[in-house]
């Protein structure tokens, strides 16, 4: 019986810790914004790639979440589909900038990152 109780306690702690570790959409957006500023100021391809990769990880995580404004919507609602599409667009833009950085094209990667603002502005109007 002691082993069963320990197993249940361990399972409960693990499930709780994974919930605590999961970032909210708002947290992910803060991470994206923080690294976006660094991308625009990057002075090397190594730095820009590191920050673009951090943005990508946060964008993928945010895409799995539900923004506060959409909490009352069902998973397959038009609004949720549009939110996920917006995240797909951003992830694609990040991938494009990463590809340029991988080719050593720092200035072009920074220019491509400027386009992220249009995507942000479009989707923030709807879901922020």
Swiss-Prot record:
Q: Which domain of life is it from?
A: Bacteria
Q: Which cofactors, if any, are listed as required?
A: heme b
Taken from the UniProt record, the cysteine pairs bridged by disulfide bonds within this chain are none
Q: Which residues form the signal peptide?
A: 1-22
The cross-references to InterPro entries, in alphabetical order and at most eight, read: Cyt_b562 (IPR009155), Cyt_c/b562 (IPR010980)
Entry annotated with the keyword Transport: yes
Q: Which residues bind heme b?
A: 29, 124
Cofactor binding remark: Binds 1 heme b (iron(II)-protoporphyrin IX) group per molecule.
A GO BP term here is:
electron transport chain
Q: Which family does it belong to?
A: Belongs to the cytochrome b562 family.
UniProt protein name: Probable soluble cytochrome b562 2
Q: Source gene?
A: cybC2
């Amino acid at each position: 019986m002691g082993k069963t109780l320990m197993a249940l306690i361990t399972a409960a702690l693990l499930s709780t810790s994974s919930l605590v570790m999961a970032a909210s959409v708002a947290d992910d957006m803060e991470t994206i914004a923080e690294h976006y500023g660094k991308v625009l100021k990057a002075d090397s391809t190594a730095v820009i790639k590191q920050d673009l990769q951090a943005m990508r990880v946060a964008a993928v995580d945010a895409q799995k979440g539900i923004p506060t404004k959409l909490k009352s919507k069902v998973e397959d609602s038009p609004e949720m589909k549009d939110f996920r599409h917006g995240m797909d667009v951003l992830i694609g833009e990040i991938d494009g900038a990463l590809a340029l950085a991988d080719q050593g094209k720092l200035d072009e990667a920074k220019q491509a990152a400027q386009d992220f603002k249009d995507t942000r502005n479009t989707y923030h109007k709807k879901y922020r």
